[in-house]
């Protein structure tokens, strides 16, 4: 059996510290990159008086600092802030900050360039009604 000298122990301890630091840094970087929205569909209902049209009711939860990718909605969007505050920018309009109790409307097929939690420390939540064609997705990424 080989005896490890004190200098070898010190080198191993130092190497383990660097490995641990690298692991923590990687986890923190992944957490920052993956902070996105969480969409939950509550209801999807066809409209009897509008053939082929559906209303989708959903919530969008934003963790602190969360950001949605730029996207487009196929139909009309009606959004209401249930909790926190959200920054939204559609097409060439100025970014707007909407707080709890406020609502807004988005025209169909307009690029939604910014949609994010305005806070780095508090969550935010939206209630959204989307009126669209039955076959369309809730949102599509901007290419």
Regions from the language model: what does each represent?
Residues 2-56, 89, 104-105, 113, ...:
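A short, N-terminal "cap"/entry segment at the start of jelly-roll beta-barrel domains
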Residues 52-57, 73, 93, 109, ...:
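Extracytoplasmic
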Residues 53, 65-80:
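A short beta-loop-beta micro-motif enriched in histidine and acidic residues
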Residues 75-93, 102:
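Glycine- and acidic-residue-biased ligand/ion/polar-headgroup-sensing regions
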